[in-house]
Amino acid sequence: MPIEAVAVASLPMASRSAALCFSSAAAARSRSRSRHGRMAVSCDAGASDLLYSSLAAKLLGPPTSFDAGKLTVEFAHSHGNSSSGFPRAYTLTHCDFTANLTLAVSDTIAADRRLRADDVFAEWKQQQQQEGMALHVHCFVSGANLLHGLAAGFRYYVFSKELPLVLKAVVHGDALLFAEQPELLEAKVWVHFHSSSNAKYNRLECWGPLREAANAETTHKRHALEQLHNAITKGTRRRRRKWSSPDAIFSALLALLL
């Protein structure tokens, strides 16, 4: 008689994120719906789609809503609390336990901060000729941590899903800059996804004007995310018979607990 399901692990109070730690909020919602707070891993190949869909639903849930009350802004000494212009860079960090956001505004991105793969970095750059300024955002999908490579697809999706929240934090936290230079809201947003372990996720995307990119309901990005979700769902059917292997189960757990 085949084993239908095996409870393998209790989820932690606050899991590390697949990217930016935003998946921890989804994990909390999933735990609140589970009576025992455990994840069932099916050993039956016929039930693999259900398992993978549950895993995807946890990480690919709705975007996190921006709450200005949870945002703390820290200005470097050279900027003070005013819009002192450029160069200008941002580092956004997230706390698992409180869901608080911290936006650090500085001249440049410190090299040691780039090693924190769950943070998001952004900087203003002058474009060629008369195109004005553009905001370049950097997300580290995989490479710094071997375990991140096993969950690269999920990390890429979570970064994409939560990027409007990041941009809203920048616009709100650096409000004086945008008050003095409102044209920056029309600046293009270029998103650099960095992945040294998976070339598929090592890519550059143009998200359009900042005003639109910060809107989670933007039609273009919503359509793109739906396409990515469908691609992952199709991948589920192709991998149906692989879920009984220890490697597949291990990868799923890493995606949940990173």
Curated annotation (Swiss-Prot):
Induction: Down-regulated by dark-induced senescence. Circadian-regulation with a strong expression during the transition from dark to light. Strongly expressed in leaves, stems and panicles, and at lower levels in roots and seeds. Pfam families: Staygreen. InterPro entries: Staygreen. It comes from the Eukaryota. PANTHER family: MAGNESIUM DECHELATASE SGRL, CHLOROPLASTIC (PTHR31750:SF18), PROTEIN STAY-GREEN 1, CHLOROPLASTIC-RELATED (PTHR31750). Belongs to the staygreen family. Promotes chlorophyll degradation in leaves. May be involved in LHCI proteins degradation, regulating the balance between LHCI and LHCII. This is Protein STAY-GREEN LIKE, chloroplastic. The lineage of its organism: Eukaryota, Viridiplantae, Streptophyta, Embryophyta, Tracheophyta.
